[in-house]
A protein has these predicted regions:
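Beta-rich carbohydrate-recognition and catalytic domains
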Residues: 1-144, 148-194, 203-266, 281-283, ...
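Beta-rich accessory regions
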Residues: 206, 229-494
Length: 494
């Protein structure tokens, strides 16, 4: 029995997994590589595990892609399709897949950038004989994300100088020889090391304009404690990233973590988020996922024989808010393919909705739930999931304080690590008074999208087998629900 095995999130069959790596789309397949320990369920012997999917939802496990060798571990990085064979690694007129990763030499702990290539759709890989391609003799230089920049006709590498809270940009014509272009940082939150950067352009809704987003994952010191991720919005000319003024928050003594940066997830368990390369232009989406865990307790979570899962795939976009341009996320539409039984409640107050839920036996640990609360001026409302008489994970909005929150203090096993139990909140401007919550509940996780992804929370939970209930709550009898939809979700493994 594997009581906490997620049924629609990617997990390795066994052993330790952390950051998603090398995410690339090629010939109908989404590739997911990931930090993997082939030898055990704790961090170590870092190599790249591998899985492929036609839809980012249903995954096929593949053999280890890049293995630790000669005292060099394979740390995080990216992958791409070298369409014009600029690297010369192509074969028989077909473009190679090229992986760009950090090598970590265990003897002196120096980190450097390396490349490898594949001529068989990522099934087997050859490490480049000229590695490393960048070596600055640093112990904190990692996680290269590489993309083609059309305007300057060259490859751009975004890579972190982790301990200096900087991101470096390098340029190359052939993926082998690299030139330093510029640096960004320190900026935003600097309470931990900067890791797993990403850089991508997104359209600005309602205009013909675009903005660049620089993503920086950070550990520890993030908004929910431990690992998390921030972003900057600005412009990139192929050489330098310049953040817009309202994207930079000047440091101030006494400022809380939540106020010190723009965070893309306010829960404790969404880290190392990076986006897929080479998604077809005809699709047009920027898609990503993250490691659903936290370095504070990731090695202690009560699961066996595997440790860690990936989040669901998400689409990221920009939105104009009262505070400025902000990043929003929503579940990738492919998640709808998992919907099974559907329960729809039209409208009514909280007690009517709860009676309806009970009457129809709406419960489970594989659920998608969407609820909208009607406008009102004050009070707290939300939903409890994975509920029993003694346990529940509580998701809600406190209108008085202008905060959305997730409370896992009574979610089940919270004692396996002293830093696991907690309440996590985020500022929320309730514009027209309506509040929308969109939840994905799996065997050991809850992902929450508030008000169309304006705020997102990702949280691990370890409930008892009996904790399967769903219940709405409101602090005032006037709390009304304008719509409620619940779906049971199918397993991706059956």
């Amino acid at each position: 029995m594997e009581p906490f095995r997620p049924q629609y999130h990617y997990t390795p069959e066994k052993n330790w997994m952390n950051d998603p790596n090398g995410m690339v789309f090629y010939e109908g397949e989404y590739h997911l590589f990931y930090q993997y320990n082939p030898a055990g369920d704790k961090w170590g012997h870092m190599s790249w595990g591998h899985a492929v999917s036609p839809d980012m939802v249903h995954w096929t496990h593949l053999p280890l892609a890049l293995a630790e060798a000669d005292n060099v571990m394979i740390f995080s990085g990216s992958a791409l399709v070298d369409w014009k064979n600029s690297s010369g690694f192509g074969k028989d007129g077909r473009p190679p897949l090229v992986a760009i990763y950090t090598g970590f030499r265990t003897t002196d702990r120096v980190q450097f950038q390396c490349i490898a290539y594949s001529n068989d759709k990522g099934r087997t890989w050859t490490k480049y004989s000229g590695n490393p391609v960048i070596d600055i003799n640093s112990r904190d230089f990692r996680d290269p994300k590489v993309q083609w920049h059309d305007a300057t006709r060259r490859w751009i590498m975004t890579v972190s100088l982790s301990a200096e809270h900087k991101v470096r940009f390098y340029g190359s014509d052939n993926l082998k020889a690299w030139t330093l272009l510029s640096e960004f940082g320190p900026a935003g939150a600097t309470g931990g090391v900067w890791e797993c950067p990403d850089l991508f352009e997104l359209p600005l809704p309602g205009t013909n304009d675009k903005r660049w987003v620089l993503v920086v994952n950070m550990n520890p010191g993030s908004v929910a404690g431990g690992s998390g991720g921030q972003y900057f919005i600005g412009r990139f000319d192929g050489t330098q990233f310049v953040a817009e003024r309202d994207s930079l928050i000047p440091p101030r003594p006494g400022r809380s973590a939540s106020e010190s940066a723009h965070w893309f997830d306010y829960g404790p368990d969404y880290y190392a988020a990076v986006s897929w390369s080479d998604v077809p232009v005809s699709d047009g989406r920027r898609l990503w996922l993250g490691w659903m865990s936290n370095w504070e307790y990731g090695g202690d979570v009560p699961t066996s024989p595997w440790r860690s899962a990936m989040s669901i795939p998400r689409e990221v976009g920009l939105s104009r808010t009262a505070e400025g341009i902000r990043l929003v996320q929503k579940p990738a539409r492919e998640m709808e393919s998992l919907r099974d039984r559907h329960f729809a409640f039209k409208s009514g107050d909280v007690s009517e909705a709860n009676a309806w839920l009970k009457e129809r036996h709406v419960q489970g640990d594989q659920l998608e739930l969407m609820v909208e609360f009607a406008p009102r001026s004050s009070g707290t409302e939300g939903v409890k999931v994975l509920k029993s008489d003694t346990e529940a994970t509580v998701i809600g909005v406190d209108r008085q304080r202008g905060r959305a929150f997730v409370d896992r203090t009574q979610s089940g096993n919270v004692t396996f690590h002293q830093k696991f139990s907690g309440v996590y909140d985020a500022p929320l401007a309730v514009h027209d008074g309506r509040v929308k919550l969109h939840l994905f509940v799996d065997a050991s996780s809850v992902e929450v999208f508030v008000n169309d992804g304006e705020r997102v929370f990702t949280s691990l939970v370890y409930p008892s087998a009996a904790s399967r209930g769903v219940e709405l709550f409101g602090s005032m009898t006037s709390a009304r629900i304008t719509s409620l939809n619940v779906w049971t979700l199918k397993s991706i493994w059956k």
